[in-house]
Regions:
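Conserved glycine-rich cofactor-binding loop
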Residues: 12-14
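Conserved glycine-rich Rossmann-like NAD(P)H-binding loop of the short-chain dehydrogenase/reductase
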Residues: 28-43
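Conserved Rossmann-fold SDR core element
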Residues: 81, 160, 170-184, 226-233
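Substrate-binding pocket helix/loop in short-chain dehydrogenase/reductase
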Residues: 96-97, 104-109, 198
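Catalytic loop of short-chain dehydrogenase/reductase
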Residues: 133-171, 183-184, 237-239
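Short C-terminal tail/terminal secondary-structure segment
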Residues: 144, 227-251
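C-terminal substrate-recognition "lid" of short-chain dehydrogenase/reductases
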Residues: 209-233, 238
Length: 251
């Protein structure tokens, strides 16, 4: 059974938007959380509603607990019950323990770990008996640690652990799984050449196809024998000794 009543954080752009498109279809309802991407969210809403979906946009800053709590309340009001939560949105800034500061720490931990925890808790209150899923978008770096992106890495390793422990807590009525992507879309700090060097340094020497991530989401939803698993979908980057920090490549 496919998901029918879905929440996607960071669903207006990049990986989140691609997942929304993958899961959309006739009678599918999706709440898309955005923060700074309203225009892109509106365009996506129009596109997906042409496929027969009902799309609801909500602005929320995942660093603010009051904003996070209103997402599930909004979704419940619009859709009744819920059956799928995709914790996709994240803050991704570079810091190191040597220049630790509370602002960066709080931004990452609040948006990338605390928000998914709150959303998962609230989501669990509004599901029916059946095929219910939480899918956390993590990062391959949880399998291949480096000292870079200090606060981000800690937030994602926390989300990795939460995927495992919440799968135990929410079973059998909610399955919880995660996807740990590698180099998929160039970020704003990277040049095209840096991004190319990054994915060419993976064992498969290829950029992660965003459709592969979407297909993995679909796989987790449909396969009712899987919970508590995190799939490294990274062209083998987590196996690699040629990580960006070794090669001197910007991330």
């Amino acid at each position: 059974m496919d998901a029918q009543k879905i929440i996607i954080t960071g669903g207006a752009t990049r990986i989140g938007a691609a997942i929304a498109e993958q899961l959309s279809g006739f009678k599918v309802q999706i709440v898309i959380q955005y923060n700074m991407s309203r225009a892109k969210g509106e365009l996506l809403k129009k596109k997906l509603e042409k496929k027969g979906s009902r799309i609801y946009l909500i602005k929320a800053d995942l660093r603010k607990e009051k904003d996070v709590k209103k997402i599930v309340k909004f979704a419940k009001t619009k859709m009744g019950y819920l059956d799928c939560l995709i914790n996709n949105a994240s803050v991704f800034d570079n810091d190191k323990i040597e220049n630790f500061n509370s602002k960066s720490w709080n931004n990452h931990l609040d948006a990338n770990l605390k928000a998914p925890a709150i959303l998962s808790k609230e989501f669990s209150k509004h599901v029916m008996k059946g095929n219910n899923n939480i899918i956390n978008i993590i990062d391959q770096r949880v399998f291949k640690l480096t000292p870079h992106f200090f606060s981000y890495t800690l937030s994602k390793t926390g989300l990795y652990t939460m995927t495992k422990t919440s799968a135990m807590s929410f079973a059998p009525n909610i399955r919880v799984n995660g996807i740990a992507p590698g180099p998929t879309i160039k970020n704003k700090r990277q040049s095209n050449s840096h991004f190319k060097k990054q994915y060419l340094a993976t064992p498969l020497r290829r950029q992660v196809n965003i459709n592969d991530i979407c297909n993995a989401v679909d796989f987790f939803i449909k396969n009712r024998s899987i919970t508590g698993q995190v799939l490294a979908l990274d062209s083998g980057q987590s196996l690699n000794w040629q990580t960006p920090d070794i090669l001197g490549i910007k991330e």
